[in-house]
Each structure stands twice: as structure tokens, then as C-alpha cells.
């Protein structure tokens, strides 16, 4: 810790997480913070990372730009409606998710009702349920007769040789055009809000890519994996859809409590990181927290600089933030890294920060009474060729309890994506009118049935797109981390975009 707190004569004898205080002739107190590890970014990845480190007894702090934690996760409660402005569900696709809730409060984990197993696809003029067995697969109108027969030969097709083959290319090659059009394309819109002909399979859908590369076939690989004995830990990855009791923000609150809220510094803007000494780091920023912030960092995060002398400098310094650490983990978006890591070679930063993000408009629509109508499914996805103005509609109140009043319904509607980015700039009136029209047409809601809730959330840079440029991005990340072994670049710029992916990555940092 000597190199981290060198400004204090006896810093080697001080406990971690110490505020060092100095005074000038005017008696103005300044402070600086020292931790073993600093996590930059208070979204899900950053919070789980800090929580897991605290479980190991590591002295860790979280630095967040906004005056709230959670990143895109934000739960709202209005009347009897509970809705999200960001991700609302995920799948138990990794054991780390179940293990995390074991460490927190198991009762927080809310598994979806059985209705969530049903998924709808818009086909011609109606929603059609996706097949979930042999018979439904043979009879579904979503796949042409030609492609149904063609699928029989899938186990015998050769492996792809292009490592940058896109999701669209591999699915058409192995499955056929109708599978691509009615399954893969809407799935990619629902997960990435992206274009399957731009997303590289080995980055965007690594498990699918591994099936072909390891077993030579999707079908053969899936069968082989089902036959492979699973460990007790493997069985924790049940693939079930999950959320949290009371909304996703409950998870954020529990993580904050587990970390220790005094270790979370909010409202730190203009953050700049720089190497300090042989094996240390210094993070400087400006504290812009408000009084009603979730954590009071006005007391916890002010600057420490022995060389400030006059009153003007001291007054400015009161708003500064300094934190020193032995290790730094960044979990912030790729576009925030050039300012934060200005000491890194510009060519490497460019390869990391040019990551493309899909813009998404998310609209919560609630009805207190849907006049007996039932929507027994997880939701409906829309192929890009269908000519609709929405990418998909989720049914949170069908999947989870207490999302809407009894007899009512809550819908989460998604628009925009890489194909229609213009929606993020559209007016509230245009979005509302379009969404209600689509709900009426696609779900059969009466035109005289007025919603009791409409809330619009715009996310100009919502979802990272794992396109061909990911090769350069991952190489640049590896080069930076090799040059600076105590610096880790994490977050959804690599290792997957879903909440379960974020939890898995964080548990391994």
C-alpha cells in the first residue's frame, strides 16, 4: 500500500479504505481514499464483481458516474404496476447465477411461471407458437416443407471454415432460409436488437458456434450434450427464466448491502485513471452528487493534494475525488474508456472504443382490465421481414406475479434496433400512437381500450453488437491487460451481453 498512499508519512501502517486528511491555512479539510481494488462502473457487472471480492475479504470500492447504481437496471412501481426501464428477465444459463442468489437471499430469485415456456413468432397476420417438440416441429407453419426435409441432412453437412461467419450465414447454411427468417432473425432482434448478417457467430452465439466446431452439427452436438453426465454444479444451470421479487432493482439493492454502501462512490464524473508508482493506480474525478443520491459521497469522496495553497485552488479541490488502488477493474461502456484510460496507446483504445451499440426504445404499457383476455406466453418476437414497427412484445404479467393488477396486463414493447435507429429520436406522441396501434393489431386489443400506464424509455446506446470488429477489440483488450497486469477491462464489451453472462464474468474476475 506504500505506493498508493505515499502522501501520508505512515501510510504503510494504515488500514485499507482510509480517508487521509490534510488542512491548509484556512482550515479546509481534504481527503483521499485507498483500497486494494477499485471497480469503475456501478452496473450489474461492477456490483457483482465487488460483491464477490468482498466475500473473499478483499478491500474493494465501486466508483460510479451516475447518482444511482444499477446501470440499465431500473425498476418502477406505479399503482399496481411494476415495470422495468431496462432488462427484466434472464435465463439461468450459468451456475454462477444460482450461486450468487445463494449468497444473497434465495427468496429474491423469482422463476417464471410455466407460461413463459411458450414463445410466439409473428407469422403473416398472427402470432404462432414456436415448436417445442418433434410433432410441433413437423407441423409448424413457420418452416417450409423443403427446409423440414433439409433439416434431416443437417448432421451430415461439413463444418464451416470461416471463423467470422455471421449468425445469418451459418443458420441459412445449416438450417435453411425459413428457419433463418422465422426463428434466427427474430431471436437476434429480441436479444441483440441487431442484424444477424453482421453479428459474428463465435462472439454473439458462442455456444451455437461450439456445437458445430466440436461435434460437426447442431443436432448431433445437442444430442451429445444431453447425453453427457452433468455435475451437481452443472445442474444449477436450469435454463429457467428468472427475475426478482419486486423487480430487478431488488438484486441491485442486495448487492449494494453486501458490498457496503459506504464503499460505493456515486456522481464521480470526468474520471481519469493513471498508473502510479510501480504497481499502483490513481483515479481522479469530479464529484457531482446531489443531496438525494442513493449514497452520500459528498462526505466520502473529496480530493487530496498537498500542493494546493491558495483559497481559489482549495475551493475547487473540495469537489475533486481521488482514489488509489493496487488493482483496477473497469466495467463501464466501451465509449467511456478513451477518457478514463487516456494513458493507453491511442490505436489500442480506438480498437476497443469503436464498439457499435444498438439503440432501443422500450415502452411499458399497462391495462388494469384487459376484459378477460389471456396472454399465456413469455412474449412475441417479430421477423424483420414482417413489416411491423415493433421488434417484439414481452408479457411480464404473464410470467411473474405482482407485475399488474388482477385481471390486467403489463406489456413491454421494443422498437428501434440497428435496423430502425430513428425511433430513438421520435416524439412521445409518435411512439405512443404506434405502440398502441401495434398492440391492437397484433394482440387483438379493442381500439376503445385505453391504457392506464404508458412509459417510454429511450436507450441510444443500449446493446453492444459483436460484429467482425470484435476481433480487433478483443486483441486490444488482451494487449492492454498484458501491458498493465493489474488492470482488467470487463463489462459487456466482451463475454456476452445478458444478465447471466454479466454475472458469470463478474464471478470470475
Model-inferred region functions:
Residues 153-273, 280-281, 287-313, 324:
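Active-site/ligand-binding neighborhood in enzyme catalytic cores
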Residues 75, 98-120, 178-182, 357, ...:
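A short alpha-helix-loop-beta-strand transition element characteristic
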Residues 17-18, 31, 56, 266-411, ...:
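Mid-domain catalytic core of redox enzymes
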Residues 3-4, 17-20, 24-31, 131-135, ...:
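Conserved flavin/dinucleotide-binding core of flavoenzymes
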Residues 54-77:
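Glycine-rich FAD pyrophosphate-binding loop
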Residues 35-62:
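N-terminal Rossmann-like FAD-binding beta1-loop-alpha1 element of flavoenzymes
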Residues 45, 68, 335:
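Conserved Rossmann-like nucleotide-cofactor binding loop
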Residues 79-159:
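Dinucleotide-binding Rossmann-like beta1-alpha1 core, especially the glycine-rich loop
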Amino acid at each position: 500500500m506504500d505506493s498508493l498512499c505515499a502522501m501520508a508519512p505512515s501510510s504503510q501502517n494504515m488500514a485499507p479504505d482510509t480517508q487521509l486528511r490534510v488542512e491548509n491555512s484556512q482550515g479546509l479539510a481534504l481527503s483521499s481514499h485507498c483500497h486494494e481494488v477499485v471497480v469503475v462502473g456501478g452496473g450489474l457487472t461492477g456490483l457483482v464483481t465487488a460483491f464477490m471480492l468482498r466475500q473473499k475479504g478483499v478491500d474493494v470500492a465501486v466508483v460510479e458516474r451516475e447518482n444511482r447504481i444499477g446501470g440499465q437496471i431500473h425498476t418502477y412501481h406505479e399503482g399496481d404496476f411494476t415495470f422495468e426501464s431496462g432488462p427484466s428477465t434472464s435465463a439461468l444459463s450459468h451456475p454462477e447465477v444460482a450461486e450468487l442468489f445463494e449468497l444473497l437471499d434465495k427468496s429474491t430469485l423469482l422463476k417464471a411461471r410455466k407460461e413463459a415456456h411458450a414463445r410466439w413468432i409473428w407469422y403473416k397476420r398472427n402470432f404462432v407458437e414456436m415448436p417445442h417438440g418433434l410433432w410441433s416441429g413437423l407441423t409448424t407453419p413457420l418452416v417450409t416443407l423443403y427446409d423440414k426435409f433439409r433439416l434431416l441432412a443437417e448432421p451430415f453437412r461439413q463444418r464451416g471454415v470461416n471463423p467470422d461467419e455471421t449468425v445469418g450465414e451459418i443458420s441459412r447454411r445449416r438450417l435453411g432460409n425459413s428457419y433463418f427468417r422465422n426463428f434466427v432473425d427474430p431471436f437476434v432482434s429480441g436479444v441483440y436488437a441487431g442484424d444477424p448478417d453482421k453479428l459474428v457467430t463465435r462472439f454473439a452465439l458462442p455456444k451455437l458456434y461450439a456445437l458445430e466446431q466440436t461435434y460437426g452439427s447442431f443436432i448431433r452436438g445437442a444430442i451429445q450434450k444431453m447425453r453427457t453426465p452433468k455435475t451437481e454444479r452443472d445442474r444449477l444451470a436450469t435454463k429457467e427464466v428468472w427475475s426478482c421479487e419486486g423487480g430487478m432493482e431488488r438484486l441491485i439493492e442486495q448487492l449494494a448491502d453486501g458490498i457496503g454502501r459506504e464503499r460505493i462512490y456515486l456522481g464521480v464524473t470526468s474520471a481519469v485513471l493513471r498508473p502510479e508508482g510501480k504497481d499502483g493506480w490513481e483515479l481522479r474525478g469530479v464529484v457531482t452528487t446531489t443531496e438525494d443520491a442513493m449514497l452520500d459521497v459528498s462526505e466520502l469522496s473529496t480530493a487530496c493534494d498537498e500542493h494546493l495553497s491558495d483559497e481559489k485552488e482549495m475551493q475547487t479541490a473540495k469537489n475533486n475525488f481521488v482514489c488509489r488502488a493496487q488493482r483496477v477493474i473497469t466495467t463501464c461502456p466501451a465509449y467511456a474508456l478513451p477518457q478514463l484510460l487516456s494513458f493507453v496507446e491511442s490505436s489500442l483504445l480506438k480498437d476497443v472504443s469503436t464498439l457499435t451499440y444498438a439503440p432501443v426504445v422500450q415502452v411499458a404499457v399497462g391495462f388494469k382490465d384487459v376484459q378477460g383476455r389471456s396472454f399465456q406466453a413469455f412474449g412475441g418476437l417479430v421477423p424483420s421481414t414482417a413489416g411491423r414497427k415493433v421488434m417484439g412484445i414481452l408479457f411480464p404479467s404473464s410470467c411473474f406475479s405482482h407485475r399488474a393488477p388482477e385481471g390486467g396486463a403489463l406489456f413491454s414493447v421494443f422498437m428501434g434496433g440497428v435496423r430502425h435507429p430513428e425511433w430513438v429520436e421520435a416524439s412521445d406522441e409518435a411512439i405512443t400512437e404506434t405502440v398502441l396501434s401495434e398492440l391492437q393489431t397484433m394482440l387483438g386489443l379493442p381500439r376503445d381500450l385505453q391504457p392506464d400506464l404508458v412509459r417510454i424509455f429511450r436507450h441510444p446506446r443500449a446493446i453492444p453488437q459483436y460484429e467482425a470488429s470484435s476481433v480487433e477489440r478483443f486483441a486490444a483488450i488482451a494487449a492492454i491487460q498484458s501491458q498493465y497486469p493489474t488492470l482488467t477491462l470487463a463489462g459487456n464489451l466482451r463475454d456476452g451481453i445478458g444478465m447471466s453472462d454479466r454475472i458469470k464474468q463478474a464471478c470470475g474476475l
